[in-house]
């Protein structure tokens, strides 16, 4: 009897071990598959890319933060063209888009965009839709569709690379982006930075370019502009920004790289000073009386989460800034984005002109 019981216990233990092993292997292969797809997408980036943006929608969908972000983004419920696309193709980017990489290449005054997306496509339906809304042509081994839509006033081309992968480009030659195999020097420059961001489902890597400084200045919030900060950012060779969901929050990490230790030190000191200045400003008694308490609390949470570090990687010197974006901050940002600007509100003129006196009033004064 005891022997039978021992065998049962041994059988249960063996079964549990086998199930656990199978689960671990499945998880391992699933992660390897996602990592392999990500790596392969990034290897297709054109060699002359200036900026690369990567988004893993599958990983983001598993996080509560995506729901918060989706609720924050304004939606157009009357986008008839997109609704027609969904009806005709059965493809919805909210549900079926898995991964996408976008490469931006600057050539002086000309900017080219090349994007590759992985998703659950019904290829026949999608190609039929493109055929109805554009013209098809064979470019090498690719059947490309020239769409009626444009990007930067240039024709937009789209082609299936496989049943699950599609490419978009505004190059004159639609196969130029896919056919341009990056060199070893390209991989040597970009891959270490891609690998550092391997745990982030959302990131952008930017190689220094004269247009980047202008774009960063244009994107400054609230019209904020600092010549000193612009000059320091202009001395960075690389900038990377990554986001990683953590429950209903998003951890954002921005890093600037340069070869000059002095530039890294000056940038770190400037950002530390800016952080301290912002914290002191929010604690100013006069500002606290004027400011919405919830808005102030959201900004304070953001600033308290900030961490600024200097990193030494041999010849490369980096400054890293980490922040945590909370649902409370998104709510405040949404309210701020929909608020009516002060210069558009109806206000009486500062020096209202008196109405001209009528002839009757003039005659009365003479009397």
Predicted segments, located by residue:
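Short, Lys/Arg-rich N-terminal segment immediately upstream of the first membrane anchor
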Residues: 1-6
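Helix N-cap motif at beta-to-alpha junctions
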Residues: 119-122, 171-174, 257-263, 325-329
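Solvent-exposed, non-transmembrane alpha-helical starts
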Residues: 124, 176-180, 264-267
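C-terminal regions of proteins
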Residues: 236-246, 250, 255-257, 288-315
């Amino acid at each position: 009897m005891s022997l039978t019981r021992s065998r049962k216990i041994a059988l249960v233990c063996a079964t549990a071990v086998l199930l656990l092993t199978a689960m671990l292997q499945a998880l391992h292969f699933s992660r390897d598959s996602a990592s392999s797809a990500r790596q392969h997408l990034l290897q297709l980036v054109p060699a002359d890319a200036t900026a690369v943006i990567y988004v893993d929608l599958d990983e983001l969908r598993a996080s509560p933060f995506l729901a918060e972000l989706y609720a924050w983004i304004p939606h157009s419920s009357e986008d008839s063209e997109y609704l027609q696309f969904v009806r005709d193709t059965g493809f919805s980017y909210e549900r079926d888009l898995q991964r996408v990489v976008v490469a931006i290449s600057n050539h002086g005054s000309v900017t080219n965009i090349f994007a590759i997306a992985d998703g659950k496509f019904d290829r026949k339906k999608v190609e039929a839709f493109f055929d109805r809304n554009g013209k098809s042509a064979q470019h090498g081994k690719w059947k490309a569709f020239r769409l009626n839509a444009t990007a930067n006033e240039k024709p937009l081309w789209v082609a299936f690379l496989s049943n699950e992968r599609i490419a978009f480009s505004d190059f004159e030659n639609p196969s130029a982006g896919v056919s341009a195999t990056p060199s070893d020097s390209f991989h040597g420059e970009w891959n270490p930075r891609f690998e550092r961001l391997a745990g982030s489902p959302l990131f952008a890597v930017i190689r220094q370019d004269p247009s980047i400084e202008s774009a960063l200045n244009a994107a400054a919030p609230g019209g904020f502009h600092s010549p000193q900060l612009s000059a320091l950012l202009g001395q960075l060779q690389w900038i990377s920004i990554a986001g990683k969901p953590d429950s209903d929050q998003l951890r954002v990490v921005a890093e600037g790289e340069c070869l000059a230790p002095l530039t890294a030190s000056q940038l770190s000191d400037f950002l530390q000073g800016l952080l301290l200045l912002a914290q002191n400003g929010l604690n100013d008694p006069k500002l606290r009386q004027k400011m919405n308490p919830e808005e102030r609390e959201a900004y304070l949470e953001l600033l308290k989460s900030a961490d600024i570090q200097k990193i030494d990687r041999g010849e490369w010197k980096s400054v890293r800034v980490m922040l945590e974006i909370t649902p409370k901050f998104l709510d405040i940002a949404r309210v701020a984005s929909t608020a009516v600007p002060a210069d558009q509100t109806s206000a009486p003129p500062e020096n209202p002109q008196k109405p001209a006196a009528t002839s009757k009033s003039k005659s009365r004064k003479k009397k």
